[in-house]
Amino acid sequence: MAAIRLDRSHALYREALSVLPAGVSSNARVWRSAGPRMMPFSLFVSKARGSHLWDVDGNEYIDYRMGFGPVILGHSDPRIHERVHAMDEQGLVYALSHELEVTVAKKIASMVPCADMVRFANSGTEATMHAIRVARAYTKREAVVKFEGMYHGAHDYLLFSTDPPFDRARGAPKAIPMSAGIPRALQNLCLVERWNDFDRIEKLVKAKGDRIAAIITEPIMGNCAAITPRDGYLKHLRQLASDHGIVLIFDEVKTGFRVAPGGAQARFGVTPDLATFAKSMGNGYPVACFAGSTEIMNTIGPSKVVHGGTYSGNPVSLAAVDATLDILKTGEAHAKLESFGSRLMRALAEVADEEGTRMLVNGVPEMFQILFTRQREVHEYRDLAKCDLAKYAALHVELLNHGVMIDEDNMECFFTCEDHSDEDLERTVAAFHTALADVNAGRVHMPEAASGA
């Protein structure tokens, strides 16, 4: 199998380096293992339709990144575009109230167990940042518990120990800053614990509960290979939070509206006090929200907790949400995701068995990941230290050559969408079989680009 050519992407990346720091608009777009002739690298996209994506060199891929998860129906879904384009004609942003805010908030409240009240935002980072502020105001406490390996946005409150080097993730977890520029004072307000460990979180809460405003957790570790909670773990967090007057926050930026119409809280039957959403709620449009009980959400308002934003609740984004939720609330799209994802997970595991490769398929059909490991289960970030990340990186390259797009980062997930087809499944499994055989044989065909590109 010949390697794909990425001449135009290569040239654009070199050009971008002169005007965009690191050549990108988000650090996560820098690939470290797939660039032709130069490292790092970023793939440049020309278009996306349905379950497929095309780069600027004309290479077509079956897409399992889905923009890090927002695209739950398919790229450029005409049902969403029709509603959005109709709203375009009424104006893009008012920075005033409009009826669709009420309509969509009521729709979210009807679907999400914790959502008595809703506030709209523009990104998952905004949503989690404001949820933390609300929790601190409500409890009149300042410390926040987060879990090692979880990412809750790029704000300073929680950008600790999202993916610490494995040689530093030993012993008792520490709040390790993941960026330069984070004030040291915030480190003392972020208490980091290991996920899925009943005893450790109970000891922490009993020792420091009177300082803790919130426990924030993803119900499924969306930036940690789709690790799922142990049976009863989310209920344990719920009980601990209730017993100690702590606000339990579910970060559903990735799981929300994806793993069930009512999010992971509906799937697992555990209701938090607050929850944050983004990504799938708009099928790719930039929109987010945070929601929770009336008592807690009513801390927001003039002369109380500040929340605002010129673009928050703008009519165009909410038109996308309105249309997307109308489709998702029936459950039919989720049935397709569940069926497709289950079959794909099973087929990939069968290929690995045929190739004699120890591989774990981890997660749920709507979002999952493959891990090259001898472990039968993974329960926390530190378990990923026992996975062959280099082998996954090589597989990523070979799958690109075969027209299948997974994320370069083994901590990320495969995301399925309603538009993924039986043909996509067959092509993916065939590509995976060939790619895995090549990787096992030490054959990795790096993408190529002209030296002068």
What is each of the regions a protein language model found here?
Residues 1-453:
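Conserved N-terminal phosphate-binding loop of PLP-dependent enzymes in the Aspartate aminotransferase
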